[in-house]
């Protein structure tokens, strides 16, 4: 094992939340990341501020990332899910302090309209957004998050009607 791999594995995971946001047609909000040239689509996610509960963090992050908090939590994941970022990204993310994220996931029903969504927030994360079907979600997600997304889909699938 190389020194950089060992250092990578010694780093902790950043605590965070992820949101599977459903519209009235049970399609899922996905955004294309603004900070990469590759087509990197993902569901909204973000960090937990010290002292904040995961559910409060999820609603705050929803507002920060899609410009709306019109919605309500249907379910919270039973587990913390984690993913590692590719080692070349570690120095570029979170000041190199984390190997990836461990996240609590939330299934959220969006009660607003498309016009309520504004990704041009004060710190934009996405340059495009759209609603994706459950079937297409896993095919458009950035590969290093795919295993985590498969687990989240498996947990929430029965609640998406």
From Swiss-Prot:
One of its GO terms (biological process) is mRNA catabolic process. Keywords: Hydrolase. A motif (Nudix box) lies at residues 46-67. Its EC number is 3.6.1.-. Its cofactor is a divalent metal cation. InterPro entries: NUDIX_hydrolase-like_dom_sf, NUDIX_hydrolase_CS, NUDIX_hydrolase_dom, RppH. The keyword Hydrolase applies. Residues 12-154 form the Nudix hydrolase domain. GO terms for molecular function: mRNA 5'-diphosphatase activity. GO terms for cellular component: cytoplasm. It comes from the Bacteria. Accelerates the degradation of transcripts by removing pyrophosphate from the 5'-end of triphosphorylated RNA, leading to a more labile monophosphorylated state that can stimulate subsequent ribonuclease cleavage. Belongs to the Nudix hydrolase family. RppH subfamily. This is RNA pyrophosphohydrolase. It comes from Rickettsia conorii (strain ATCC VR-613 / Malish 7).
């Amino acid at each position: 094992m190389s020194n950089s791999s060992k250092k990578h594995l010694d780093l902790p995971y950043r605590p965070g939340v992820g949101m599977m946001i459903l519209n009235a047609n049970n399609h899922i909000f996905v955004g294309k990341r603004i900070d990469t040239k590759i087509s990197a689509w993902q569901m909204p996610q973000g960090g937990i501020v010290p002292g904040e509960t995961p559910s409060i963090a999820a609603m705050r992050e929803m507002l920060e990332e899609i410009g709306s908090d019109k919605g309500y939590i249907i379910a919270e994941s039973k587990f913390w899910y984690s993913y590692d970022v590719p080692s070349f990204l570690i120095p570029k993310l979170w000041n190199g302090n984390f190997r990836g994220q461990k996240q609590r996931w939330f299934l959220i029903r969006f009660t607003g309209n498309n016009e309520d969504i504004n990704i041009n927030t004060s710190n934009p994360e996405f340059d495009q957004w759209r609603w994706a079907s459950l079937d297409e979600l896993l095919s458009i997600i950035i590969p290093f998050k795919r295993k985590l997304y498969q687990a989240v889909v498996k947990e929430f699938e029965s609640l998406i009607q």
